[in-house]
């Protein structure tokens, strides 16, 4: 784990492939620095939860990695390739290896769910209309939406259905890497828990690497393999939940050991104890 007292980068095990590698990243809006020499690794096959206080730049980092926000300086490698050194054609190929679920879904309101899912397919320019229809229906089924949702417009969907439709679009080209920006935001507790379960199932079934920006403690506890925390423009700690709970940084202590964090941690420990007793 990394923290302020020990600023070195967490060393990956020999068998862990680094899918996203960020080094000494600086991002600024005007004279305001948002990222100040940020370092981060995301490993193949893991679910990484990325947390931080409001306005700290969690979504900005995700959008910078995606190339939607310009960086001032620093290195961003995706699948072992320096993003800055890719040609336009190489960049398009790399971009097809990931999918994105933006905050609030970001579906095109004038398109049906089917058409939204097909958008990434159309951009490739070599998938037939018939195959796009078949694939769109498969993606709908994959995220747990009924076939009847295909021809609905976003305004006709519930919040949970919008999230699932947006996830289906993110999975349209069978990506290796999925970016999720606050996927459970706006969902009720039951809907959020169901969406967490869906993400975990898809990650396991499809072998996805997941980069998830979130503030949802339930998601962090239930589906994340590792957590990285952002404060003061840097990753102040990165590691599994046990290490995050032991970190002495003031923000992390307030986040994980506050009233809600302590209550959730206690409930999960109680559940684990009951499960262990049930196996005896």
Predicted features, each with a name:
Residues 66:
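Helix-to-loop junction immediately C-terminal to a conserved catalytic motif
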């Amino acid at each position: 784990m990394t923290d302020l007292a020990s600023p070195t980068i967490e060393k990956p095990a020999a068998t862990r492939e680094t899918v996203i590698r960020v080094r000494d990243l600086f991002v600024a809006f005007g004279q305001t620095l948002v990222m100040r020499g940020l370092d981060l690794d995301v490993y193949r096959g893991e679910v990484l939860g990325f947390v931080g206080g409001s306005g700290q730049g969690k979504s900005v980092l995700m959008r910078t990695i995606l190339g939607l926000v310009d960086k001032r300086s620093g290195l961003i490698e995706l699948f072992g390739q320096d993003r800055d050194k890719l040609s336009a054609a190489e960049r398009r190929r790399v971009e097809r290896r990931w999918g994105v679920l933006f905050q609030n879904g970001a579906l095109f309101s004038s398109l049906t769910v089917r058409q939204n899912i097909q958008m990434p397919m159309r951009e490739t320019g070599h998938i037939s209309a018939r195959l796009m229809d078949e694939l769109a229906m498969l993606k709908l089924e994959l995220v747990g939406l009924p076939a009847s949702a295909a021809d609905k417009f976003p305004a006709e969907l519930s919040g949970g259905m919008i999230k699932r439709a947006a996830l289906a679009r993110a999975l349209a080209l069978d990506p290796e890497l999925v970016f999720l920006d606050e996927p459970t935001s706006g969902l009720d507790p039951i809907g959020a828990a169901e969406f967490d379960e869906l993400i975990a199932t898809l990650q396991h079934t499809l072998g996805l690497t997941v980069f998830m920006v979130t503030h949802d403690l339930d998601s962090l506890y239930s589906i994340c393999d590792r957590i990285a925390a952002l404060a003061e423009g840097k990753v102040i700690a990165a590691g599994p939940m046990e290490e995050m709970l032991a970190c002495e940084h003031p923000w992390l202590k307030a986040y994980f050991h506050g009233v809600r964090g302590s209550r959730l941690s206690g409930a999960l420990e109680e559940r684990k104890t009951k499960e262990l007793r049930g196996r005896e």
